[in-house]
């Protein structure tokens, strides 16, 4: 695995982790305010779920060295 490919995988993993943790935190806030009388555990639970999902995705990416994520290229019409 080349260094640039490894860097792309790390970048993708960190971006995925930020999105999933942020989404879990946001859902935790919503549930905390609406259902659980402003308790803190929904925030921790949502963030933990997001972190766990991101970790699982990163682990899968790094253990599949031959799986390359491609980009879609539009075919130009003539």
Swiss-Prot record:
The modification N-acetylserine is found at residue 2. It is found in: Mitochondrion inner membrane. InterPro entries: Mic10. Keywords: Acetylation, Membrane, Mitochondrion, Mitochondrion inner membrane, Transmembrane, Transmembrane helix. Residues 37-78 are mitochondrial intermembrane. It is a single-pass membrane protein. GO terms for cellular component: MIB complex; MICOS complex; mitochondrial crista junction; mitochondrial inner membrane; mitochondrion; SAM complex. Component of the MICOS complex, a large protein complex of the mitochondrial inner membrane that plays crucial roles in the maintenance of crista junctions, inner membrane architecture, and formation of contact sites to the outer membrane. Belongs to the MICOS complex subunit Mic10 family. This is MICOS complex subunit MIC10. It comes from Homo sapiens (Human). The lineage of its organism: Eukaryota, Metazoa, Chordata, Craniata, Vertebrata. The gene is MICOS10.
């Amino acid at each position: 695995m080349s260094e640039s490919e490894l860097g792309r995988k790390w970048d993708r993993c960190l971006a995925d982790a930020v999105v999933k943790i942020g989404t879990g935190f946001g859902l935790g806030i919503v549930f905390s305010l609406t259902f659980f009388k402003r308790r803190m555990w929904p925030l921790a639970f949502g963030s933990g779920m997001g972190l766990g999902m991101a970790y699982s995705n990163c682990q899968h990416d790094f253990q599949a060295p031959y799986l390359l994520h491609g980009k879609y290229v539009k075919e130009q019409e003539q």
